[in-house]
Each structure stands twice: as structure tokens, then as C-alpha cells.
């Protein structure tokens, strides 16, 4: 099993969310081999994400990006004492089952890899291992939480070294939560109905192909064995919890475009619980220094003098990409 042995007899929601809380306030770094994993651990990372390539290289290589080779993940698991996460393609249940059997500590159902299912994300409640998923807005976040995600992260635009999309996603979620808090419960239920609509895409497409009316029957399953009304009720319950808390009910990390200590500090200043760093560490000129600096920036996010000091003599950050010039927008994957 993974380092923390958190997936005992049954992976309850409490256990899964408990693991996510254990990494709260920290930095999770993408690594592609044992040496990088050790650098991340020594720099103070709370966890590492095992990949075959960092997002910048996945973007550059093109083609179909899949789960990392098992040997690579095992090599990384054997190299460190901190928790190890790994990515699967959106909707790829079999990849997730393989990683669960391998004993990773958390699975990232990630838009960085090529999606496997054009209609649905994995029903994460069927697994013992906890999941993290990306979200651009509150609707995506609530859907992933209802499906069983123990942790949410911004999608940002991975592999760009450009923080703008992560900032966009943080603001979209935060401002939508503030709007929810001003709504009546009846209005919140209407939002739940709107947020549930993506689960109807497959059923509607089948009806269109078959020449049938678009209307979905109340007792008709549309996602696994769940009907549309059951999904709406589930999303409504989560939205009411969000309304009460004033935030997501799970740990919420920033990801996608973090490339400097100041980027990491900005995400924490905007209310994030921690930071994922993908290409920003090992595409910089001095990965060891950059890794330590970003960890320190997250620890001292509200101390500008400390951020200034740790930003000295850390070399060049990764080369950034302008979002409008991208041919492929990874953040648009998933529903």
C-alpha cells in the first residue's frame, strides 16, 4: 500500500478527505523519476505526483498521453517516504483500478492526460483510494465532489508557466460561492439542476440518434445507476454545505501555471489550501533551489519580505507560454 496506509478495509469519505487534509498547506510536485522525487522530498514537498513526462513535455510531445508506466510509478514510490500520487485519464476506470492495486496514495483524474471517456468522469465512490480532480468553475467542482473526489484543484493551464488561468478559476469558484450564499434554498436548488445538466449529454445524444423526444424520464439512469433527479439532489446537498461553509467542503489546491515563488504566494493569498507545481520545478534552471523557494513561499505566503529574500539567486523560471497562442487548451477537457 501507499506510504500512509489510509485506504484500509473501506475507503470512506471521511478517510479519503482526511488524507487530503494531511497535505493541506503544502506543495505537491510533479516528478518523472526517483532522483526528482528525492529532490522534491528534500525540498519539503508534502507529496509527489508521478508522471512519465511533466505537463510542458506532454504538451510539446502531442499524441495520446496515458497513465505513467507502472515501473516508473513503483520506482518513485520506492524512492521517497512522502505520499505518492499518480494521474489517470478522465473516465479511465481501468487505469484507476491499476493504480489502486499498485498502492498509490491518491489518484488524479487529470485533464493533462488525454481523456478516455467523452461523456463522464469516474465514479470515485466506487474506489477505496482517494481522488483529486481539477475544476475551472463551481459547477465542475461540485460535480467532482458529488462523484467522490476528496480534493479539488484549479485546472489552470498546465505546462505553460502562466498563472492567469489558475487565477481565473480561483475567482470563478470564489465569486460563485459568494453568490450562492446570497441565494434562497429554492434558488440554490435551481443552480443544482443547472449543474446536473452535463450528466444528460449521453442520454440526449442517444435520443437524437434514435429519433426520440429529448425529454429524460424521471426514473431513467443517466450516470451509472443514478437518475437525473438523484444527481440534482446530491448536488443540492453539496451546494447547501458550501453555502453554510463559505468555501468548498474539501481541500482546494491551486494548480496549472505556478512557476515562481511569487506565483505560489499569490495562490495562497487568494485562499487556496496549497499548491501543485507541475513543470515549474524541473523546467527551471535550478530545480533544487526553485523547489525549496516555492515551498518556503507557500509557508510564508503573507510575508512579502520573506518572499523577496527566497526569490534571490534561484535561477531562471521555466519559459512561459501565452495562453491565446495555444493550439490545445488542456483546461477545456472534462465536464
Swiss-Prot record:
Keyword Lyase assigned: yes
Residues where D-glyceraldehyde 3-phosphate binds: 171
Active-site residue numbers: 87
Q: EC?
A: 4.3.3.6
Q: Which GO terms describe its molecular function?
A: pyridoxal 5'-phosphate synthase (glutamine hydrolysing) activity
Binding of D-ribose 5-phosphate occurs at 30, 159, 257, 278-279
Q: Which UniProt keywords apply?
A: Lyase, Pyridoxal phosphate, Schiff base
Q: Which top EC class is given?
A: lyase
* GO BP of this protein: amino acid metabolic process; pyridoxal phosphate biosynthetic process; pyridoxine biosynthetic process
Which PROSITE patterns does UniProt cross-reference here?
PDXS_SNZ_1, PDXS_SNZ_2
Reactions that this protein is recorded to catalyse: aldehydo-D-ribose 5-phosphate + D-glyceraldehyde 3-phosphate + L-glutamine = pyridoxal 5'-phosphate + L-glutamate + phosphate + 3 H2O + H(+)
Q: Which domain of life is it from?
A: Archaea
Q: Which pathway, per its entry? A: Cofactor biosynthesis; pyridoxal 5'-phosphate biosynthesis
Q: Which NCBIfam families match?
A: PRK04180.1, pyridoxal 5'-phosphate synthase lyase subunit PdxS
What is the role of the protein in this entry?
Catalyzes the formation of pyridoxal 5'-phosphate from ribose 5-phosphate (RBP), glyceraldehyde 3-phosphate (G3P) and ammonia. The ammonia is provided by the PdxT subunit. Can also use ribulose 5-phosphate and dihydroxyacetone phosphate as substrates, resulting from enzyme-catalyzed isomerization of RBP and G3P, respectively.
Among HAMAP family, the record links this protein to: PdxS (MF_01824)
Q: What is known about its subunit structure?
A: In the presence of PdxT, forms a dodecamer of heterodimers.
* Stated family: Belongs to the PdxS/SNZ family.
Protein name per its UniProtKB record: Pyridoxal 5'-phosphate synthase subunit PdxS
The gene for this chain is pdxS
Amino acid at each position: 500500500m501507499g506510504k500512509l496506509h489510509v485506504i484500509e478495509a473501506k475507503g470512506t469519505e471521511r478517510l479519503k478527505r482526511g488524507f487530503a487534509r494531511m497535505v493541506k498547506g503544502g506543495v505537491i510536485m510533479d516528478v518523472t523519476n526517483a532522483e526528482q522525487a528525492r529532490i522534491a522530498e528534500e525540498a519539503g514537498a508534502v507529496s509527489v505526483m508521478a508522471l512519465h513526462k511533466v505537463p510542458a513535455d506532454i504538451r510539446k510531445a502531442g499524441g495520446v498521453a496515458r497513465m505513467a508506466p507502472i515501473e516508473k510509478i513503483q520506482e518513485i514510490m520506492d524512492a521517497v517516504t512522502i505520499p505518492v500520487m499518480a494521474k489517470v485519464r478522465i473516465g479511465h476506470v481501468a487505469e484507476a483500478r491499476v493504480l489502486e492495486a499498485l498502492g498509490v496514495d491518491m489518484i488524479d483524474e487529470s485533464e493533462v492526460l488525454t481523456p478516455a471517456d467523452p461523456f463522464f468522469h469516474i465514479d470515485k465512490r466506487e474506489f477505496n483510494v482517494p481522488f483529486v480532480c481539477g475544476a475551472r468553475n463551481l459547477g465542475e467542482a461540485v460535480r467532482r465532489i458529488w462523484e467522490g473526489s476528496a480534493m479539488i484543484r484549479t485546472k489552470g493551464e498546465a505546462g505553460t508557466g502562466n498563472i492567469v488561468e489558475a487565477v481565473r478559476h480561483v475567482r470563478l469558484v470564489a465569486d460563485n460561492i459568494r453568490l450562492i450564499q446570497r441565494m434562497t434554498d429554492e434558488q440554490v436548488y435551481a443552480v443544482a439542476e443547472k449543474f446536473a445538466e452535463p450528466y444528460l449529454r449521453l442520454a440526449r445524444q442517444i435520443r437524437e440518434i434514435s429519433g426520440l423526444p429529448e425529454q429524460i424520464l424521471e426514473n431513467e439512469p443517466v450516470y451509472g445507476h443514478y437518475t437525473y433527479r438523484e444527481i440534482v439532489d446530491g448536488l443540492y446537498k453539496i451546494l447547501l454545505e458550501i453555502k453554510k461553509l463559505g468555501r468548498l467542503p474539501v481541500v482546494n489546491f491551486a494548480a496549472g501555471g505556478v512557476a515562481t515563488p511569487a506565483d505560489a504566494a499569490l495562490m495562497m493569498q487568494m485562499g487556496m489550501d496549497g499548491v501543485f507545481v507541475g513543470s515549474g520545478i524541473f523546467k527551471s534552471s535550478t530545480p533544487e533551489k526553485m523547489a525549496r523557494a516555492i515551498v518556503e513561499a507557500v509557508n510564508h505566503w503573507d510575508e512579502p519580505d520573506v518572499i523577496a529574500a527566497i526569490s534571490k539567486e534561484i535561477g531562471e523560471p521555466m519559459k512561459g507560454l501565452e495562453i491565446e497562442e495555444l493550439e490545445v487548451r488542456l483546461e477545456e477537457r472534462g465536464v
